[in-house]
Amino acid sequence: MFNSQKSNTLRMNFRVSYILLVLALGACSSTPPQPNTQANIAQQSIVNQADDVATEARFSENLNALLTQISQSQEIPLQTLETGFLDAKTIPSIRKLVLPPSGTFKKNWLVYRKRFIEPVRLKAGKVFWDENQAFLSQVEQESGVPAEIIVAIIGIETIYGRQTGNFRVKDVLSTLAFSYPETPNKPAREQLFKDQLKELILMCWTEAGGKLPAKVSSQGMNSTRFNSCLNQNSSYAGAIGLPQFMPSSIRNYAVDGDGDGRIDLRQSPKDAIASVGNFMKKHGWQAGMPVSFPVQTNAIPAAKELADGDPQLKYTVRELIEKGILTKQQGDLQNGGVEPQSKALIVDLPYPDKDGSDQVQYFVGLNNFLTIVQYNRSYFYAQSVAEFAEALGYQNQSVVPVEKIEGPTKTVNSKSASEKTKSKKVNSKKKSKPA
């Protein structure tokens, strides 16, 4: 049925012995030092990613245990998994990248915003929109997510595929699953990345044509495609493709947008667009509703009292109007606002001023703001998406048909959200093209 514990131990010992042999040979090499050519520097940067012998041995032991567990639970031949991970290694630089900022670090909303809402990304966004306009409109109609929001997310994530990461995803997830840096939340973070590593393996297995459970057979599975999937590039956190989906999100929310029978978030813009729309829809995006409202200047003290950093919709819009944080119009669905009973939260975006004093910009986040937070758990990120979308022409206000507000007996004199977006885009297409 499955290999015995003795057999598993032999495999693990073989892998550890293999690592020790490679490192020993490297240490004993009599090859004279090579000049720092570009090729040699690139090679060194890869070789130096490996950790010390003891760390690599522990890494191999833990990885082997996980592969055995997956083999048993999914009936995947263990040898196939071991072959796919034979060259897996820890990446010390990644452990540094995931460390929390130092105690003296100050969050800076203005710097963050400037990094993402800038001419290069906006120009690329307009080009991406023009190249995919018809499909974006189709996805907007199907999902209710405005095209500008989808374009903004992909632009902020990777500049439409220009920056998708340069780490092998199996190395990233293995490193963070078994060698996460010493932080207070280390156990929870390691478990998260173990789960993502499992998801990666199952994702790659099915992408390569394998079935689950596999019934101890690789029949129908293309091993080349399986290994290629494990070795694909990712961010330092293991996110993949144009929209930077984690493996679990790919398995749960990614869709085949171009209809070629497979999901490819790295090379297919249509797959990326459709997948972002599907993710947002499944996480509660409300069609025709705004993302956030600015706080009234004279109500900043009131907003400060309610801001607690907890991403929960705690207050009604009516309550925020009564406190002077929002205007009456923002609680009027027929005038670009939302219904008074709609729930909201106070969003605080801190930054230091030129003198180093702490300042905060406040917004009222609505349901759709929180949906964006589900994509990337950061208030900075969510508000940047909203403002990037506005720079592309997104109208951050409600767009609801009159019959939905007043009932079917009233005259319809308002277009749907998708129709307005299409009309707006056609009318402003010349303006939106890059200079």
Predicted regions and their residues:
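N-terminal secretory signal peptides that target proteins for export/translocation
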Residues: 1-12
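Sec-dependent signal peptide recognition
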Residues: 13-22
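C-terminal motif of bacterial Sec signal peptides marking the signal peptidase cleavage site
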Residues: 26-27
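An acidic, Gly/Ser/Thr/Pro-rich helix-cap/linker signature
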Residues: 31-131, 137-140
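Acidic helix-start/capping segments at beta-turn-to-alpha-helix junctions
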Residues: 79-105, 155-158, 167-175, 294-302
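Acidic/His-rich structured neighborhood in mature extracellular/periplasmic domains
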Residues: 109-275
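Flexible, glycine-rich surface segments
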Residues: 226-344
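C-terminal soluble interaction/assembly domains
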Residues: 298-435
